[in-house]
């Protein structure tokens, strides 16, 4: 979808989704597994439970971003993230279209 044209060169500009990462952290084994969640401090969905995560910075590797976001939001130092899912529903975030990459950390 073309969103605009460059005023200088006339080329089309395209809107692209932003990339976010979510950390899935578990502990325990068998039937007593626990999952680490945070309570969102800001809109959208303020006060709701969520996986720790956030936006990937420009030039940042998503695997580095998920480790950074996990540390920033929980104080937990993760390592060796493993990609487990991708979620691209345009309605997931009311602010903008995001592609969410889920990592087991």
Segments predicted by a language model, with ranges:
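A short coil-to-beta-strand element that immediately follows conserved catalytic motifs
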Residues: 76-85
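Conserved Nudix-box catalytic region and its N-terminal flanking loop in Nudix hydrolases
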Residues: 32-76
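Active-site-adjacent beta-strand/loop module that shapes the phosphate/pyrophosphate-binding cleft
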Residues: 87-105
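Acidic, metal-coordinating catalytic segment for phosphate/diphosphate chemistry
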Residues: 1-24, 29-30
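Short polar/acidic secondary-structure junctions
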Residues: 14, 28-30, 40-43, 92
């Amino acid at each position: 979808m073309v969103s605009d044209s460059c005023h200088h060169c006339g080329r089309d500009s395209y809107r692209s989704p932003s990339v976010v990462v979510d950390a899935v952290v578990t502990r325990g084994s068998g039937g007593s597994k626990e999952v680490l969640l945070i309570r969102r401090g800001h809109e959208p969905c303020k006060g709701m439970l969520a996986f720790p995560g956030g936006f990937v910075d420009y030039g940042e590797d998503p695997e580095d971003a998920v480790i950074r976001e996990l540390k920033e939001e929980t104080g937990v130092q993760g390592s060796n993230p493993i990609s487990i899912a991708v979620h691209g529903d345009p309605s997931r975030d009311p602010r903008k279209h995001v592609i969410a990459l889920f990592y087991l950390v």
